[in-house]
């Protein structure tokens, strides 16, 4: 099947969803509901003459995720999410950069997930919620889960389908949060405080080793005259199953992240994400310093539109990268409550400890429908 045919079918589905979305019923019953997201993006990289092996070229991809929820009672829920995609965009090796220009779950990501021989089933879990006096709540989840559903959240920098596309501005790349494998999560909320913990067993890492992951997030919601602010601290650690640079021993991965977002009135918002990691194992980056501005379209009578401006600096680890820089800005135009179109511009630069540097621009267009 050609790339055109593999992409044209999801594009046709995108058109059909757009035509039917306003009339769709998402709650089949008061207990059963479904939803999903269908996106299509095309990105073109402009590298100039410095990297003739890669060159100026473009690629597209169309991911589709469908989810179903069954909640027999308000305290119990069964949930499953399936992922399909046509194409890998510039993530297929076309791009010379170490960071993925689009952090979406694309064609290669939904097949043989984590070396498990499982295709398309991203998450499947059961959750039970315990409610206590004094506005306390404890939710326990078990099954196939995604650590990023619980940890390293951010109101303005956490969604590759509606916000920034570059992986450094979606989550902390040095934070190694795993997705789509067996595990459990606990979420405790008390007034403005929350603690979330995740434990997972991941089938296979890049070294081919099975490993355990543990993460915990402490968060606080602050209400002020400026608006709502969310302040989070995240700790991550794995079992010692990651090869060191020499490939002679296995080590643990450890990291610490801070993820803050703060409203500045009705139009503006700001965010930062800082992170640090050990380099006992082979690591591309050891630290991250990123931040940006979110601007709502209320200022020009487009309240559902958004402008995002973000920058990230990643200090290299022990794999030969001195540092990586990424700048990204996007305009998201909301056509209606279901569909939006985004224009996206990225600049990336990988500075190496030895040898030349790689830099260039990536121009993108993204269409997204949520239902």
Locate the predicted segments by residue:
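Surface-exposed loop and membrane-interface regions of Gram-negative outer-membrane beta-barrel proteins
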Residues: 44-62, 70-124, 135, 207-210, ...
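Transmembrane beta-barrel strands of outer-membrane/channel proteins
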Residues: 36-42, 80-84, 140-144, 197-201, ...
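Repeated loop/turn-to-beta-strand initiation elements of outer-membrane beta-barrel proteins
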Residues: 32, 75-78, 134-138, 192-197, ...
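Residue-level signature of outer-membrane beta-barrel architecture
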Residues: 26-27, 69-72, 128-130, 187-190, ...
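Residues that define the transmembrane beta-barrel architecture of outer-membrane proteins
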Residues: 56-64, 117-122, 178-182, 210-214, ...
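Outer-membrane beta-barrel "beta-signal"
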Residues: 293, 339, 359-371
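Surface-exposed coil loops of outer-membrane beta-barrel proteins
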Residues: 93-125, 132-217
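Transmembrane beta-strand segments of Gram-negative outer membrane beta-barrel proteins
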Residues: 24-53, 163, 307, 343
């Amino acid at each position: 099947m050609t790339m055109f045919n593999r992409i044209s079918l999801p594009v046709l589905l995108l058109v059909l969803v757009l035509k039917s979305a306003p009339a769709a019923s998402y709650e089949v019953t008061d207990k059963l509901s479904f939803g999903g997201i269908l996106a299509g993006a095309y990105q073109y990289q402009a590298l100039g003459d410095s990297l003739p092996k890669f060159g100026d070229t473009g690629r597209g991809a169309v991911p589709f995720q469908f989810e179903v929820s069954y909640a027999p009672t308000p305290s119990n829920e069964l949930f499953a999410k399936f992922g399909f995609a046509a194409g890998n965009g510039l993530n297929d090796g076309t791009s010379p950069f170490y960071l993925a220009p689009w952090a979406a779950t694309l064609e290669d990501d939904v097949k043989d997930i984590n070396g498990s021989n499982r295709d398309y089933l991203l998450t499947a879990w059961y959750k039970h919620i315990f409610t206590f006096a004094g506005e306390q709540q404890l939710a326990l989840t078990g099954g196939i889960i995604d650590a990023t559903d619980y940890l390293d959240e951010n109101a303005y920098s956490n969604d590759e389908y509606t916000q920034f596309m570059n992986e450094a501005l979606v989550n902390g790349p040095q934070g190694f949060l795993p997705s789509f494998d067996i595990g459990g999560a606990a979420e405790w909320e008390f007034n403005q405080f929350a603690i979330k913990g995740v434990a997972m067993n991941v089938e296979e890492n890049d070294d081919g080793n099975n490993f355990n992951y543990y993460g915990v997030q402490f968060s606080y919601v602050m209400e002020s005259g400026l608006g709502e602010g969310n302040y989070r601290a995240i700790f991550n650690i794995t079992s010692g199953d990651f090869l060191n640079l020499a490939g002679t021993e296995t080590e643990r991965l450890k990291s610490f992240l801070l993820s803050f977002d703060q409203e500045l009135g009705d139009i503006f918002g700001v965010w930062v994400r800082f992170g640090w990691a050990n380099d006992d194992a082979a690591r591309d980056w050891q630290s991250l310093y990123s931040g940006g501005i979110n601007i709502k379209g209320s200022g020009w009578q487009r309240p559902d539109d958004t402008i995002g401006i973000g920058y990230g600096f990643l200090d290299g680890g022990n794999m030969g990268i001195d540092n990586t820089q990424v700048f990204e800005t996007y305009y998201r135009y909301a056509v209606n409550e279901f569909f939006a179109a985004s224009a996206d511009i990225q600049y990336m630069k990988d500075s190496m400890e030895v040898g030349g540097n790689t830099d260039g621009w990536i121009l993108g267009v993204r269409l997204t429908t949520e239902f």
